[in-house]
């Protein structure tokens, strides 16, 4: 994914695109905080609430929490692509 760089956010490992947060490891190390459009977030949560969820803190923001213990590894590339599209400037989306 063009422009993605390793970084940190709130003291945890993160990925950013052009300085904009794409995802980060949650403080507890058991989940990731992933940028996600609201509509898609609701679909993920409705389809698998054990894997995808939010807390009150994230309710008004375009983020979803993803349980690393529950998520299917083959789902990660698609999730990263959705997050990348949500975070990256339109010009950078050549994937």
What are these regions (language model features)?
Residues 1-95:
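Charge-dense, helix-prone N-terminal extensions
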